[in-house]
Amino acid sequence: MNLDKIQEMWERDAVINPDNLHDESLKIPQLHSKYYTVYNTVTLMREKAREQYTKIRLERHNYYTGKAPAEVYEEEPFPYKVREKDAIQRHMDADEKLTKIDMKIRYYDVTLKFLEAVSYTHLRAHET
């Protein structure tokens, strides 16, 4: 499930036929259910990505501090001795594996914000 696809779905679902408001209002619970299911799915995907981030963060910390298994350094040599905490943090901040997962988490956050905005639209329909 990606943001573009969800936005396209919403663009189609948000169209209201003003000549048939009764039937349109009956669709609201179905749409709410549909987008709440998507919201829950994306939330779980984000949580899985957060879990991945935590595991990879530990692996990369061990890598930069010289505590990773020897075979890791055979596959991906690291020629520096990093001793200071802020130097380790700089390497961690620039690490491709970590930034890739961090971007995934941010993407899920943006998707969830969009879905929250969609849910507010449904709530307004119930107020009228």
Give residue ranges: language-model regions.
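Eukaryotic intrinsically disordered, low-complexity tracts enriched in Ser/Pro/Thr/Gly and charged residues
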Residues: 1-9
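Short, charge-rich amphipathic alpha-helices with coiled-coil/heptad character
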Residues: 9-37
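Short, well-structured hydrophobic secondary-structure segments
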Residues: 30-63
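Short amphipathic alpha-helical segments with coiled-coil-like heptad repeat character
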Residues: 50-51, 115-118
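Extended, amphipathic alpha-helical coiled-coil scaffold segments used for oligomerization/tethering
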Residues: 55-99
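Amphipathic alpha-helical coiled-coil segments
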Residues: 94-116
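Conserved small/polar residues in nucleotide/adenosyl-binding loops
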Residues: 121-128
